[in-house]
């Protein structure tokens, strides 16, 4: 499959839980999603203006000129075709001038950290045992339990 043009990204103000199936791809515990879904701004990616969603993202205001990409998920059949990268580029552009920093809290598997590095994010810090302390079941990525934060690389 090749990247299909154009894509549409809409801000979803209501009925955010209708996208739970996609949200669970990015965060597998519904109670955690519930903690940020209503207070966050949700975006939905579509291939056509009235088409089915292929991706979702939720961004929260963390205060002090920081926002956080809490969840981003692309439907499995559309993964590894550039949609996630384009979604993140769109979100960074949306918040440019509103927030100084967009951070991402994520598992620290090689695949995940490589993806965020390719989007311009750099390692910021780690919260040891985040998944152990906040999830009702073990969440492992390549045998690791910790959560790390990334921020965009400095721009000239």
Spans of features found by a protein language model:
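Conserved acetyl-CoA pyrophosphate-binding loop and the N-cap/start of the following alpha-helix
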Residues: 78, 82-90
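Active-site rim helix/loop that mediates acceptor-substrate recognition in acyltransferases
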Residues: 17-48
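Conserved catalytic-core motifs of GNAT/GCN5-like acyltransferases
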Residues: 103-105, 122-145
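A short, internal acetyl-CoA/4′-phosphopantetheine-binding micro-motif in the GNAT/acyltransferase core
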Residues: 72-79, 107
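Conserved small/polar residues in nucleotide/adenosyl-binding loops
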Residues: 149-156
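Conserved GNAT acetyl-CoA-binding A-motif
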Residues: 95-107
